[in-house]
Amino acid sequence: MTVFLSFAFFAAILTHIGCSNQRRNPENGGRRYNRIQHGQCAYTFILPEHDGNCRESATEQYNTNALQRDAPHVEPDFSSQKLQHLEHVMENYTQWLQKLENYIVENMKSEMAQIQQNAVQNHTATMLEIGTSLLSQTAEQTRKLTDVETQVLNQTSRLEIQLLENSLSTYKLEKQLLQQTNEILKIHEKNSLLEHKILEMEGKHKEELDTLKEEKENLQGLVSRQTFIIQELEKQLSRATNNNSILQKQQLELMDTVHNLISLCTKEGVLLKGGKREEEKPFRDCADVYQAGFNKSGIYTIYFNNMPEPKKVFCNMDVNGGGWTVIQHREDGSLDFQRGWKEYKMGFGNPSGEYWLGNEFIFAITSQRQYMLRIELMDWEGNRAYSQYDRFHIGNEKQNYRLYLKGHTGTAGKQSSLILHGADFSTKDADNDNCMCKCALMLTGGWWFDACGPSNLNGMFYTAGQNHGKLNGIKWHYFKGPSYSLRSTTMMIRPLDF
């Protein structure tokens, strides 16, 4: 604040003092101002112009009063009286100025207090409004911040849950990856081992192939030599067969001679036994042999009606009273029973081992009188069983050697494994069964098949351990089932009235 004051009296006194000893200086003829700073307020005093009668200062370096910056210069020859008067006047003015200053200070204090009070009131109202506005804005911002915080917390919770799930999933994936890595390592080790073994096997295989090639070449040479030998043997066999035919003719002639001799002896009644004459007749079967006094099992010669040649057969004199003519026997698989019609017709094998008597001879025997059939069976566990039929005979070749049976008994099943109502005989080259499947080819051997049927004693021979699950083996269904191949079989016949 700047206050401009004119003090006429004070100006007159200063004029009087200034004009007492100096002259008017035309350069200092204008008004002069004196400014005093007190706190925030500044005071400016207007000083009057100097009178023209005042003397000019003889020197500017002489200063009569250091406190009065604008006081006029006096000459050093002023009298002491003037100086004292001037000092007295200055003291009075100084006191007056102090009073004036005190007055101004007191008035300024009250004014400043009023101004400060008004400013404080105005500032308080403004601050209240601003505070209210700030409070409202703060509350709104707080509410928004609370909502944002809630959203952030919810989002944080979801993110934490998702992070936890991702962590669990990552842990599981890491675990699975570790397991798969371990498995891959194991597989790699196994592959390395297998590759090593394969390399070893390839080396061995190569060596074996080389060995087999050498053996093949050797075998080819051997086969060539054996082929030549076989051809030579076939030639020798052909010559031997011719010789055998000659021997057979000689044997027939000898048998005729023997028959003639027997006939002559019979006519003359020349046969002594125990001192009595008995008439000797040719043996029709093993029952005749047994009744003739030969009660030891073995090979005997029997004669057939309407057949030019006798036949060697095996007679069983031990089972169930003896007198049995054996028509089939299997025991060791040494004989192949997969043969054709002609071979089954005339028979094959050795009566002392495995053999088939022949359908033509079986027909000839069973046509003489009534016969019964007994079948002896044994499995690979040593169990024995039998089936027996009270009536047995077969038809001729035109009838395909049809089988006729009656009256089944025995321990090899409550039911008969042979067809009782009649079945034709079939071989691999003569299919007479009631099936389009050709049972003789599938089941092997010649037999009385009826849609294959539950039995085949002329099937394939299987050894122990390989006899299970064999449909084409030696089977008797109601004894060991349809796929069990038996160890041995014997078919034999005896007259019903024995």
Swiss-Prot record:
Give the observed phenotype of the deletion mutant. Embryonically lethal. Embryos die at about 12.5 dpc, due to important developmental defects of the endocardium and myocardium, plus generalized defects in vascular development.
According to the record, the segments passing through the membrane are: none
Source organism superkingdom: Eukaryota
What keywords would UniProt list here?
Answer: Angiogenesis, Coiled coil, Developmental protein, Differentiation, Disulfide bond, Glycoprotein, Secreted, Signal
Q: List the disulfide bonds.
A: 286-315, 439-452
UniProt xrefs under Pfam families? ANG-1 (PF25443), Fibrinogen_C (PF00147)
- The question of whether Translocase is a record keyword is answered with no
Q: Which residues are glycosylated?
A: 92, 122, 154, 243, 295
Which InterPro entries has this protein been placed in?
Answer: FIB_ANG-like, Fibrinogen-like_C, Fibrinogen_a/b/g_C_1, Fibrinogen_a/b/g_C_dom, Fibrinogen_CS
Signal peptide range: 1-19
GO molecular function terms here? identical protein binding; receptor ligand activity; receptor tyrosine kinase binding; signaling receptor binding; vascular endothelial growth factor receptor binding
**Entry-linked SUPFAM superfamilies:** Fibrinogen C-terminal domain-like (SSF56496)
UniProt xrefs under SMART domains: FBG
Listed GO biological process terms: angiogenesis; blood coagulation; branching involved in blood vessel morphogenesis; cardiac muscle tissue morphogenesis; cell surface receptor protein tyrosine kinase signaling pathway; cell-substrate adhesion; endocardium morphogenesis; endoderm development
Domain spans labelled Fibrinogen C-terminal: 277-497
Q: Record's GO cellular component, any one?
A: membrane raft
> Any coiled-coil ranges, and where?
81-119, 153-261
Principal location: secreted
Q: How does it associate, per the subunit comment?
A: Homooligomer. Interacts with TEK/TIE2. Interacts with SVEP1/polydom. Interacts with THBD; this interaction significantly inhibits the generation of activated PC and TAFIa/CPB2 by the thrombin/thrombomodulin complex.
Instruction: Report the function annotation for this chain.
Output: Binds and activates TEK/TIE2 receptor by inducing its dimerization and tyrosine phosphorylation. Plays an important role in the regulation of angiogenesis, endothelial cell survival, proliferation, migration, adhesion and cell spreading, reorganization of the actin cytoskeleton, but also maintenance of vascular quiescence. Required for normal angiogenesis and heart development during embryogenesis. After birth, activates or inhibits angiogenesis, depending on the context. Inhibits angiogenesis and promotes vascular stability in quiescent vessels, where endothelial cells have tight contacts.
- This protein's name: Angiopoietin-1
Annotated organism of origin:
Mus musculus (Mouse)
Gene designation: Angpt1
